[in-house]
């Protein structure tokens, strides 16, 4: 299999390349009756889009959704939903000089080794352009989760280079181009990114994503664990090199008396586990974070070889993000929502007759 599909009951298959005529996806398994209109995709697609600030790629795509199937008179029918976005701002000439060169840190060499052929324009299938359709599918999952269970999925940039938030306010996240949770630091980020862009270099980042209102019981033991599927989903995003659930790698320095989340009738006293125990949701907020590497598309020369094995210096002159993490928040939200919707449907299919089990420990009221 080509591994272009995701999910078990709620499945998403994406297609298309960065500089092809269009990108799209097919969503199967969506319950019927969900109201959805093309304009509902706009908000999240624009949050992910390039060209919205000087700190992201200058490529400007309209990202207008066409609903091809699976929706009738504004409601899902239960049949496959086809979504399409036409590419309109490709600049393939930017890649003519490096079409036969393997850019260090990119998928050029690995795609060449696997397939014996590759589309060099904008990275082809390995481009982050593909994530546009994940965000589109995530719009449907987010809406269904919110309407059916009251689940709210949202994220924020929790590290840019060596800079971390010195305060936190969810309201601040949507009021700046960085999805940064502390408004007072935004000028510092602007200055940092301006200097980075002028230097021609790039930098890594970290994104946190949180789902509040997830009921207990979602997830399956062993091979269908909620945290394992969430980790795989986040790791599938371009440039992601590490994922944590809850306290993640910080758990290595903790003692059991610190890490265990004590339980009272009024609720859990902490959430080091990230809302998941034994692969199954606890009713607390599901929390995860992902680390994205610095983009390797740089104006600074780097040593590599070409398709003939000759040693060359490669310089990428196309339009690229100096920090891919800046636009990654809505992508992380989408992937978490897709995992949660798939797990919710699977839980309902197997355990729908179980009902509410006592005692029910309250989750967090606000995340």
UniProtKB/Swiss-Prot annotation:
Enzyme Commission designation: 4.2.3.5
Required cofactor names: FMNH2
Keyword Flavoprotein among record annotations: yes
Annotated GO MF terms: chorismate synthase activity; FMN binding
GO biological process terms, semicolon-separated: amino acid biosynthetic process; aromatic amino acid family biosynthetic process; chorismate biosynthetic process
Binding positions for NADP(+) per the UniProt entry: 48, 54
Record text on cofactor binding: Reduced FMN (FMNH(2)).
Record pathway: Metabolic intermediate biosynthesis; chorismate biosynthesis; chorismate from D-erythrose 4-phosphate and phosphoenolpyruvate: step 7/7
InterPro entries cross-referenced by the UniProt entry: Chorismate_synth, Chorismate_synth_AroC_sf, Chorismate_synthase_CS
Keyword Lyase: yes
Cited PROSITE patterns: CHORISMATE_SYNTHASE_1 (PS00787), CHORISMATE_SYNTHASE_2 (PS00788), CHORISMATE_SYNTHASE_3 (PS00789)
Short name of any one Pfam family annotated for the protein: Chorismate_synt
Binding-site list for FMN: 125-127, 238-239, 278, 293-297, 319
Annotated catalysed reactions: 5-O-(1-carboxyvinyl)-3-phosphoshikimate = chorismate + phosphate
CC per GO annotation: cytosol
Family to which this protein belongs: Belongs to the chorismate synthase family.
Subunit structure: Homotetramer.
Protein name in UniProt: Chorismate synthase
Gene symbol of the encoding locus: aroC
